[in-house]
């Protein structure tokens, strides 16, 4: 029965595996299958496409349209305009927990909709860049991990945003986890500022100046049992210990400083991160990383599940960081985001690098073509 329910969404999920062994995207598909199994007449889908590839989204769209045609009423919560235009007849906007309005999809412009979501006119989706790109900071040389990725190579420079993209399951997250020490490559080398380094765990990575913003902020980036300020300090607690005791006042003041820097909207930093919106929760994870002395930031799907205005705020933070000399690796499944924010783009498929592009002159079609290359056409990176 489980296999029957999951196969329309994905044929690559082993239903006998525990959920903990599935990727975030696969877990999302299982949740969708579970919801669809209940034969409900009203179905609420909360960000169901957040971790899905274009192909998986299309399959979900077809299932959703079939349910609609069968008389099921669907509330589809999303931040993606493509979801709305493909499926919805009406769109309702909430901002800061308040109802803003409801419109027929075919009677509202993008500009008006964005204005309703953001609360102001947003004239461009991606802020202007001001960073000067410098020397190579991090170089990945032919790293491999059996069952995950093979002979992956790329580099990222000071002041640069390197986009790492490809279909869900391409191995992007696993490569980033290997750079950060969560996984250990079987072969290959990692160089930081021209010197080969050994990264056996995340502590090694942080001490070397490499930080990771994980794909799943709820389970991997935040500790909801702790207040916001302790989440901010959690990656660098030693800096607040004086004479063997934790200086709570210094800890709180540093958190306030960092939260102001990233324009966090929080009434009380003693509240848990769960009290914040998705965009502000992501900012808490950013603040935690900024509390460390880093050279390289790995951002795994940094704008997943957040609205247009919050995305723009995250983009501004990224540009400010690169202007201050950080090197950023940005993993993203959203091709417009990759093209709008990255200086160079690395495309992965089935654990291999299948293309590298300068953003200027590159189109979504070129990235998608590389992502869908046949096995025999792949080239090792």
What function would you assign to each model-found segment?
Residues 1-381:
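Glycine-rich phosphate-binding loops of nucleotide-dependent enzymes
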């Amino acid at each position: 029965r489980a296999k029957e329910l999951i196969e329309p969404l994905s044929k690559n999920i082993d239903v006998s595996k525990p959920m903990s062994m599935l990727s975030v995207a696969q877990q999302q598909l299982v949740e969708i299958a579970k919801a669809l199994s209940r034969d409900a007449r009203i179905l609420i889908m909360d960000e169901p496409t957040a971790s899905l590839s274009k192909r998986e989204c299309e399959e979900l769209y077809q299932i959703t349209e079939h349910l609609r045609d069968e008389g099921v009423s669907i509330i589809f919560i999303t931040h993606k305009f493509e979801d709305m235009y493909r499926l919805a007849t009406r769109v309702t906007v909430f901002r800061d927990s308040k109802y803003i309005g409801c419109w027929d999809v075919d009677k509202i412009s993008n500009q008006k909709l964005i204005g309703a979501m953001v609360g102001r006119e947003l004239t461009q989706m991606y802020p202007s860049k001001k960073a000067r790109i410098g020397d190579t900071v991090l170089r990945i040389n032919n790293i491999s991990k059996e069952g995950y990725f093979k002979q992956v190579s790329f580099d990222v420079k000071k002041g640069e945003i390197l986009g790492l993209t490809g279909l869900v399951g391409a191995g992007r997250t696993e490569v980033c986890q290997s750079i950060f020490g969560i996984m250990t490559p079987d072969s290959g080398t990692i160089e930081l500022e021209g010197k080969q380094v050994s990264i056996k765990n995340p502590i090694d990575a942080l001490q070397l100046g490499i930080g990771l913003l994980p794909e799943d902020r709820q389970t991997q980036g935040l500790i909801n049992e702790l207040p916001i300020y302790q989440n901010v300090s959690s990656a660098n607690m030693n800096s607040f210990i004086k004479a063997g005791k934790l200086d709570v006042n210094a800890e709180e003041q540093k958190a306030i400083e960092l939260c102001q820097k990233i324009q966090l909207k929080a009434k009380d930093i003693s509240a848990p991160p769960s009290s914040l919106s998705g965009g502000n929760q992501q900012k808490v994870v950013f603040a935690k990383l900024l509390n460390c002395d880093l050279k390289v930031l790995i951002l795994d799907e940094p704008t997943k599940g957040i609205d247009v205005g919050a995305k723009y705020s995250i983009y501004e933070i990224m540009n400010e960081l690169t202007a201050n000399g950080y090197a950023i690796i940005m993993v993203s499944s959203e091709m417009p985001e990759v093209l709008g924010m990255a200086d160079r783009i690395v495309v992965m498929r089935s654990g291999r690098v299948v293309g590298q592009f300068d953003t200027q002159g590159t189109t979504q079609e070129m990235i998608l073509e590389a992502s869908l290359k046949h096995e025999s056409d792949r080239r090792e990176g």
